[in-house]
């Protein structure tokens, strides 16, 4: 299993306009995500736990365990981060022992999903209109479509559904830094990662 990260910048556009939400405006989106009574994780837990039909995923927020929380925020750096648990459904398949694939141990139905934990990081500056999102990806399983649905729902809940805000992303590395490299503004780009623990639960 190969785990990577996806890095995006994103803007929030008002429906049928070219206007983007300014992070300098009130209410402060970061404060809503991090510190509001109905903050990002509480909003998911209360309003979106279960079937997200548009993404064909089920979603849940992992609960706190004694001495540890799966969700964090930093008011100075203006970011939230944590773990969201989700799984795809809609396909039937079999689960078998790797050494004896003819011996079927479980059959997964179309309404069942294998729940996996995914890391997320969202940073909202106090000025401008461009935020940063970092998401974990496992093999071909990424959660940006799900996070886009959740973040769009959260924003429209707080800012008014009549505004019809949508989230628009740009791949940060390919579309920005690669162009800067090609234009000669950088000599090189280095990407490094520490080794990952085999047990995904031990990585956070």
Predicted segments, located by residue:
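Long, hydrophobic/aromatic-enriched structural stretches that serve as scaffold segments
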Residues: 72-141
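Terminal interaction module
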Residues: 1-97, 140-204
């Amino acid at each position: 299993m190969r785990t990577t990260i996806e890095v995006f910048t994103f803007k929030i556009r008002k429906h049928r306009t070219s206007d983007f939400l300014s992070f300098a405006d009130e209410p402060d989106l970061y404060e809503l995500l991090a510190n509001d009574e109905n903050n990002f994780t509480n909003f998911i837990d209360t309003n979106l736990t279960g079937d997200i039909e548009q993404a064909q995923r089920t979603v849940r927020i992992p609960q706190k365990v004694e001495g540890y929380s799966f969700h964090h925020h930093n008011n100075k750096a203006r970011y939230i981060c944590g773990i969201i648990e989700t799984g795809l459904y809609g396909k039937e398949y079999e689960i078998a022992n790797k050494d004896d694939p003819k011996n079927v141990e479980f059959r997964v139905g179309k309404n069942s999903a294998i729940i996996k934990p995914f890391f997320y990081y969202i940073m909202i500056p106090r000025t401008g209109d461009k935020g940063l999102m970092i998401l974990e990806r496992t093999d071909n399983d990424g959660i940006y479509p799900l996070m886009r649905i959740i973040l769009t729902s959260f924003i429209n809940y707080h800012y008014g559904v009549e505004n019809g805000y949508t989230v628009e992303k740009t791949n940060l590395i390919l579309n920005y830094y690669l162009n800067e490299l090609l234009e000669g503004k950088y000599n090189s780009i280095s990407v490094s990662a520490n080794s990952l623990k085999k047990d995904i639960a031990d990585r956070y």
